[in-house]
């Protein structure tokens, strides 16, 4: 009877340890995948492609066009600004 109890307890311990090990492996793989995805996103965000997309979007935006029109009007009509850095570029 004692041998059967020891066998059952050791079998249960073995099963629980296998389940725990599998859960840890799954967790480690999940963390590794998230870290890999994060690194790829950071690498993409630092790429020239994203920079070009952002610059193009800013240059084509209505706000930038309006700002350029305001600067042009100021540089044309305000005498003090004609020789400023704002109007030289």
Curated annotation (Swiss-Prot):
Swiss-Prot/TrEMBL keywords: Host membrane, Membrane, Transmembrane, Transmembrane helix
Topology feature Cytoplasmic, residues: 1
Underlying gene: SIFV0043
TM region(s), chain numbering: 2-22
Organism domain of life: Viruses
Membrane topology type: Single-pass type II membrane protein
Record's keyword annotation contains Flavoprotein: no
Main localization of the protein described in the UniProt heading: host cell
Protein name in the entry: Uncharacterized protein 43
Residue intervals annotated with topology Extracellular: 23-89
GO CC, any one term: membrane
Cell location: Host membrane
Entry annotated with the keyword Repeat: no
Signal peptide: none
């Amino acid at each position: 009877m004692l041998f059967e109890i020891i066998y059952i307890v050791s079998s249960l311990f073995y099963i629980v340890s296998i389940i725990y090990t599998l859960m840890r492996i799954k967790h480690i793989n999940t963390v590794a995948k998230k870290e890999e995805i994060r690194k790829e996103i950071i690498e993409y965000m630092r790429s020239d492609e994203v920079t070009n997309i952002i610059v193009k979007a800013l240059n084509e935006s209505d706000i930038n066009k309006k700002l350029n029109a305001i600067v042009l009007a100021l540089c044309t009509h305000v005498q003090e600004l004609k020789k400023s850095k704002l109007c030289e570029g």
